[in-house]
Amino acid sequence: QWSLAIHGGAGVIERAELSPERDAAYRAGLQAALDAGSAVLARGGSALDAVQAAVQTMEDNPLFNAGRGAVFTAAGKNELDSAVMNGVDRTAGAVAGLTRTRHPIAAARAVMEQSPHVMLIGEGAESFAASVGLEQVEPSFFFTESRWQALLTALREAGQPLPARPAGAPPEPSTLGKAVPLASLNEAPLNERKFGTVGAVALDSQGRLAAGTSTGGMTAKRWGRVGDVPVIGAGTYASNADGCAVSATGSGEYFIRATVARDICQRTSTGMGVQAAADAEIADVGSIGGDGGVIVMGKDGAVAFSMNTSGMYRGEAGSGRPSRVAIYADEEASR
């Protein structure tokens, strides 16, 4: 028996703001990620491979704030963070501030499996990723017009200077100010200043748990800001001993302070069910001002989704049950 759950970020997602076309595009993106991870698990593959496959699919989809759809820093750059954790032996890997590695989740896994370390950042992380053969791209690979316009809007609102358009970016479209066609992708209504992230948690047929998370961070971030995603125990955690794997999405500073992912696994280790543990932790992080959501996988394959936002892009699949995806908080997505 295997089980998989994914998320594509939590935040202010209202039906009135999401056109039928965009709704369908997000659901298709979630389904594609579920299909990628499920294919690994259905053929007896590992939870780690499934998590990586699902996350990489979302990293390549400009709809999501990870990899190709990453938001921009105040300086007009894309800085990518990711983490992965193996529940069997609690090994973990994380990267922060990547600018050229196509799949940050692959870099995080390489840190875990091919280095003596847990977290690498910036130029060193980039050099390491290249040295182990991970695909490198020009920074402009991550450019999307909608994220760029979101940055300019945020900087104007804050009264901050606007950076030059990045080298290698396509020329500014003449259609600006008009409705952007779906083909040009993301003018997402999600409040990406806090909530854009992708993640996956899995249980494989051998009972192994794993978790992985990837993000572009928050729009207009400054000073090398890093959120909860690559912080093991905050945005990402997995432990077979605790019977739990977690990937979070939300206001990263609060999720770090509340050690959200580790706390959920601490709760399940005492016998609490995954849904109760997730709900209790979201209530706790909410009590200090944090917004967002989590996906949790139990050792029996039970899936929990919990959020204190109006939506979270999410989905789940498992052996012997149909896959399903959901967007809004009031939609049923778990069993």
Regions found by a protein language model. Give the residues of each.
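Alpha/propeptide regions of enzymes that mature by internal proteolysis
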Residues: 1-335
